[in-house]
Each structure stands twice: as C-alpha cells, then as structure tokens.
Amino acid sequence: MNMNQYYDLDNGKNVMFMNDASSTSGYSSSTSPNSTNRSFSPAHSPKTMELQTDFANLNLPGGNSPHQPPMANSPYQNQLLNNGGICQLGATNLINSTGVSFGVANVTSFGNMYMDHQYFVPAPATVPPSQNFGYHQNGLASDGDIKHVPQLRIVEQPVEKFRFRYKSEMHGTHGSLNGANSKRTPKTFPEVTLCNYDGPAVIRCSLFQTNLDSPHSHQLVVRKDDRDVCDPHDLHVSKERGYVAQFINMGIIHTAKKYIFEELCKKKQDRLVFQMNRRELSHKQLQELHQETEREAKDMNLNQVRLCFEAFKIEDNGAWVPLAPPVYSNAINNRKSAQTGELRIVRLSKPTGGVMGNDELILLVEKVSKKNIKVRFFEEDEDGETVWEAYAKFRESDVHHQYAIVCQTPPYKDKDVDREVNVYIELIRPSDDERSFPALPFRYKPRSVIVSRKRRRTGSSANSSSSGTESSNNSLDLPKTLGLAQPPNGLPNLSQHDQTISEEFGREKHLNEFIASEDFRKLIEHNSSDLEKICQLDMGELQHDGHNRAEVPSHRNRTIKCLDDLFEIYKQDRISPIKISHHKVEKWFIEHALNNYNRDTLLHEVISHKKDKLKLAIQTIQVMNYFNLKDVVNSTLNADGDSALHVACQQDRAHYIRPLLGMGCNPNLKNNAGNTPLHVAVKEEHLSCVESFLNGVPTVQLDLSLTNDDGLTPLHMAIRQNKYDVAKKLISYDRTSISVANTMDGNNALHMAVLEQSVELLVLILDAQNENLTDILQAQNAAGHTPLELAERKANDRVVQLLKNVYPEKGELAMTWIPCKVKEEIDSSSDESSDAGQLEIKSEEMDIETKDEDSVELDLSSGPRRQKDESSRDTEMDNNKLQLLLKNKFIYDRLCSLLNQPLGHGSDPQDRKWMQLARQTHLKQFAFIWLGAEDLLDHVKRKGASVEFSTFARALQAVDPQAYALLVNPT
C-alpha cells in the first residue's frame, strides 16, 4: 500500500491518498473511486475523472506554438492556471537533481511527441528552493513576477531566404546562414539572448518545422575540422561570457525524399530520450513515434524551416533542466525552391513588342514551378500607381525545366497609341503572392499604320493648302462654301431658299462658332472694304442637309462658283511668294517619298547615292534649310524608319552629319529597330560618324541613355564589340551613360566589360570617376550579380584583382586610383596588338583636382592641368619638377626611408609621416589603400601635374624638415 499525494483539481490543493496498487495513472486500478470502503480524494469524483481523462488525451501544442489549442482560453484551462496546478512551460519537462520529473508534460509538450506518462506537480515541500530559477514552487510565475522569469529573446532573426544544399553539394566553401539585417560589411548571424538569469546556462539551436513544434528532417550543420556537425548546436553562456548567443557558419542540408522518414524518426527519438532522461524508449513509445513520424513526413514542407532556441541549466549530476520556454525564429525559405525561392527574371529575349500583343517572348528565370507562376505586364503613372495590367499567355508545357518561360505578350490597352509606351514585366507566384524584383522594363511599340498615318499628317496639313491650283475646299480654313454670303447686286437673295448650300456645317451653332473665331475676324479686318462691296451678311435660316435636299437652281450654282473664285483670288493675294514656294517644295518632297518603293525622300536618295554627290546633297540640304523644313525632314522617314541621319551613318558619310544637325535634324530619332543614328554609327564601326555627332553642336542634345530594341545603348554596343576608342569617346561625352543598364539582362557598362574580359575597357570605365562610382561597383544586374561577382564567376584573376583594388570596403568610398602597373601593361599590350590600319589605343593620364577631402573630380581632357601661384616662390617652378625629382632613385629611396618613420608627436605619435603628409596634401582619399610611403610617392610621381609642388613642399616641411631640404636642395 502506497501513500501518495495528488492534486485536487476541483479545490486546487494537494491531498493525501492511500493506494494499495502500484499504478501511476492517478487512481487505484483495483478499487473503484466510488467505493465507500475508502476515503478518496475529491479529485476522483466522476466528473473530475472524466475531465482528467479528456485532458490527458488532449494534443496540446507548446506554449510558444503559433497555433493555440482550442482549450487554451477555456474556463477549465484558466482555472488550472490560476490555481497553479499545472506547470505549463511549453515544450519543457522540469527535472530535479534526483531525476524526479515535475511539471506536466502533455502529448505535445516534448516537441509534439506522444508520451503515455502523466507527470504531476509534487507537493510544495518536495521542490528544493534552489530549483525555482525565477519560478514559484509550483513552476508558474505570478503576473507580477513575469518580468523576473528567465526567457529567451531573439535579437537577430535569420534571413528569409537561404539556399538548402544537398549533401553532394557541400564540397568547398558556401555561404552561411546570415541574419536578416546582414550586409556585405558587417555581416550578422542568428542571435538570441537569455534574459532574467544570472547563472551559467546552455543555449541550444536546432531545426524545426514551421507548422509544428517538431524537428525537421533537414540537417542544420556547422563545419568543424573539415566535417559537418549536425544539430542541435549548443553555446555556453554565463555572467562572464555574456548571455548573447550568436550562431555562425551554419548551413542547411536538404534531406532527400527517400531519407525523410529515417532522419525525422531519428531526430524525434533522440529528442524524446533526452527530454525523458532515459537511455531508450519502450516498444509502445517507439511504435507510436513511428506512426506520428509517418504522418508528419507525408505533409512536411521541405522548402521551409525555422530555428528553435532553448535554454538549459546543467545540474551537478549532468541533468539538463530547461530554464525558459523555447522560442522560434521566422520561417526560412529555400532560395532555390520553385515553391518558396526568390523569383527573378534574369533575361528577356527582347525588351520590345507590338501593342497588338501575341509576340513571342522568352524569359530566362530563376527556378519556378510551371503550376504556380504568372507573368504580369503592368504600367505605372508618375505616382507609382498601377494604371494597367495584363498577363502573358503560356501553357505549362511552355515552362522549360523550371528556368525558361516561352509566352505571348498581352495586347496593350490602347492599340492606337502613336508613341512607344514603357511598361514593366514581373513574375508572380499565386500561392504566396511573391513577386520578382526588380521588375524589368518593356516597351510597347505603336502599329506601323499608326506611325505612317502620324507622319503623313505632319506634312499633309501644309500639303492640303500648299498650291494655288488646289481646290477651294482647303482654302483659308473656311467651309467649302459659305451659304449666308450675299452675292453682288443682281443675284437673288440666298435667304429666300429653304435649303442651305453648305456641305460642312449642319447646325447653326457651328457656323456661329466659326464666325466668332479669331481667323474670321482677321479676315474681316484685313479686307473688310472688299467684303462689304461683294457680299452682305444675311442671318438667314441654316438647315440640316438631309436626304431630301432640294435641287440647287442654276443661279445658285453660279453663286457657288463666284464665291469659290473670290476666295481663291483672296488666297493668292494673301500668300507671299516664299510661302507658295515653301508649299511647293514641301509637296514635292512628300510626294516623292510616297511614290517611292522604299519611301525614300529626295534627301535620302542624294545622301545614299552610290557616287557621293557632295555638291548636290549640300545644295539639297541648303534648300531644305532655307524653307525651314526641319519638321518635314524629321517626320518623313523611309520604310525602315530611317531618317537622313540614319542613312548618312549607314553609308559612312560623316560630312553630311553636321549640316543635317545644323538644319535641325533630330539625332535621337529611332528607326523601326529602335536604333538612333548614333547606334547605327557604332554598330557599323564608323568612328568618323561618331566623332561628328559628339563634336558637333546639335540643336537637340544627344541622349546616350536611349536603348534600342535589343535593350542596348551606344556604349553597350561599343563594349560588346570591344571597341575601346569608340567607348572612350562616348564616356568622355557623357559619363553618366556608364550607369545605364540594358533592358535585356540589367547589365551596366561595367558588367558588360567584365563579361568581355577586357581589362582595357575596365580601366577606362573605372578611370572615368565621378561620385557615382560606388553605385556602379555595387549595382546588381537582373540576376542579382555585381560586377565583382561576375568577374569571380569568369575566374579571370586579372579582372578580379583589378575590381577588388577599387571595391569599397566597410562603408568607405570606392578607391579612385587605378594601379600604375595595370595601366602600363594595358598601354604596352595595346601598342603591341594595334594594327597599322587601326587607331592606336593610348592610355591618357587622368588628372585629379582636389577640392576637399570628400570630393574628387577627374578631368578627362587630353592635356594635363597646370596651376601656378605667382605669390609663392616655389610655385614658380614647373610642377613637372616634382616628377623629375622623384624619378631620381637616391631622392626617392631617401624620402621613402624618412616618411616611413613614426611621426613622434601629436595625438598619435606612432602614426607614420607619410600618412600625415597624405592628409595635408589632400590625398587622404587614397591613404586607406596605400601600404607605405612608396605608394604615396608613386602616386605623386604619376600625378605630378595635378599636385602643386609648393603645396607638397610646404606639407613636407611641416612633416619632416629633413625630407623638405632633400626635395628643395637635391644637390
């Protein structure tokens, strides 16, 4: 017979109970609780037994589970918590130093693992005071003491997306699981802190499922001694070490499907053994564990995990006692999964399409699921609001191996637009509404018939009234006939007739509006006397021209003819001879194009003639300029959409470009392929045409950011063709063109130079320095790669090293200096590879004008900048003297020796003299990449023309008088 204490669930206190059975189920199996032979606790009343049985069978999640059990807020549950009868600490099972468990472990309290044992709270006297750790003796803290209870708090969440790798992919080095706020520098990692506790503890990190408080089949590994150690991972914290645990260098190994059950079962079994403080489980427990694992393995999300953090105290006997409820991180999604990975469009087959839609478009994308992906086209206004959207059409079979989508573009909302419309393309995953970033630009081009109609309309307004022999239908912008005019004496009054003779105005208000117009008033003012003699206005009835219109009498026909002749005479007298000639030239110009098979104008033909008829072409340009027909020239394009400038660039006839620009031809007009004349010149490698554009003074400024239908600017085309001289001229004209990304794959000029593996172009681009250099270096293309990352993928050590030398570190500005050895090698290699018939590539010196310590401006001019200060004796010397002195080996070596010595005074006596010299000569921007005085003097030697001798000498005198004397008096 046993004497046991049981907790009275109804009265909220412990009572003594005599039991002659050894059952641990809470009551004797041999005696009914209703028997009158014994004194039973009220805890064994039928109602209580029913509730107790229901409670024991409940599958309650841990305290930190995002899914609260249905009974969490029930009156019965609240009564248990208020009375202190149940120690609900989430997934914890408190174990005292003697190995006796206390607290209640429900079915899910051990990571959602089933347990067939019920643990009751011992009597208060049995709980040693030293085991409380901020809790009351019943294991619960009162409301007033919550702030003193040990608890874990996540300081840094893990990244939202991380690549899960298979074990076969774990060779070599890979990125670790970083924190959500991690940057290139500084990096952060998942971090958790233990609060309200001042003793030694262990913080454990393990991998859990997102929808259950249960381990995940994937492995959370840390590389140690060339091997991967699987979770859980433990970190010791204490008052001396601090209570912040940072888990670094962790990776996630994706478990193959055929091993999911095995790995999950092993993890759950190990965790249950640890929590029960046993060596092995019973056969029944193993069987139930297998069944539970089978259920979880079927529905487990293999592309989403989370971290579980737990805190323990290790007792003297080796028992691990939980200190606080576990906490769980945000979900970590598999970056390479089609279901949860990051969506990204890497490249478009073409960035343009027609407004009618149904154009085939191929998208190269990151991994997507064919059953869970959409391609969205959308347009935004100036405020970023979506004003139009549509989805591309494609079948599941059009998604090729999860990395390419062949789709048909949707039609644009307005099929009659007469200009290009810029929209965007993005991917959408309907399951979680994830969208690709960045959205790539796409251009809708108008229909050719609309463009042709627009071009004809531009010239037709003048053409309609161009000739004196034209019909009076278009004269003076008046109606075909004016029915209310009174003819000369002798003619009948027109108002006596019921029908009007007007064919253009059907309502009285239209006529009134016309009469009240400014043009009509001017007509009356300019020729009012003649009008009074010829016609008298009569406000007769103006009726609608119907089908039953009365026949016009013969005398009325004479009236119409008389008025037509009248207005024709007025028109001839009103138009000056030069205007008549203007209209005739314009008419011939347009008619010739319309009657031509390729719709070439006279200007197109004389420029593109096989034999360059310079005199004839120049005369034609002069005539067009004389009559100010620039609008006609810009609007009348041939069948290919080429202007006269396009044709001149195609035929490599640069001598026509400046006259055409002077006449007002637009150099930014695009042809049907989206190419401007400058695109054509670069594509055809006609350097003289490029120079004519860049050196001319066009009335319309050249726009080097315009892209063609392939998404390329002229600079992109020059880099792709590896044309150093063309790229150099374009960059000299507009440095901002370097940062323009092509619309096909998002690569800027630096990206493309890396892909071409051209060190010469890289140095050219990096030398064209401005305040945006750091942005260019850190810019990502559509695939999310920076130029340095692309270079590392190409594995060209020379290119990688060059970019690393200028790449910004730790928030510093990008280095504004290209190693001299690299430039010398480029010069020598360019000289050797240059052919006799090609332009020689030379590396010009780039001069630096230092305005202050934070801004450095470079001059791309070919000649060095020389500055003299007549007020100082030293500045009267040629600045090149500094270069000559430093080329003297004795002086150079001696200065290096002196400047590499410690300063010996000031706030930092150990600071080297050359560093102080760099600050005083405004070269502080470069000091962080210099290792010693040799680097400083090498820079001054190269850039001596931009470093004043007097400034350098005065700074050197303040830093080291001995070095100053050596420089001023080298003899």
From Swiss-Prot:
GO terms for cellular component: cytoplasm; cytosol; euchromatin; nucleoplasm; nucleus. The modification Phosphotyrosine is found at Y626. Disruption phenotype: Larvae infected with Gram-negative bacteria fail to activate tracheal expression of the antibacterial peptide gene Drs. Ectopic bristles develop on the dorsocentral, scutellar and lateral regions of the noctum, with one or more ectopic bristles per hemi-notum. Residues 866-877 have a biased composition (Basic and acidic residues). Induction: By bacteria and fungi. GO terms for biological process: antiviral innate immune response; cellular response to amino acid starvation; cGAS/STING signaling pathway; defense response to bacterium; defense response to Gram-negative bacterium; defense response to virus; dendrite morphogenesis; DNA damage response. This is Nuclear factor NF-kappa-B p110 subunit. The lineage of its organism: Eukaryota, Metazoa, Ecdysozoa, Arthropoda, Hexapoda.
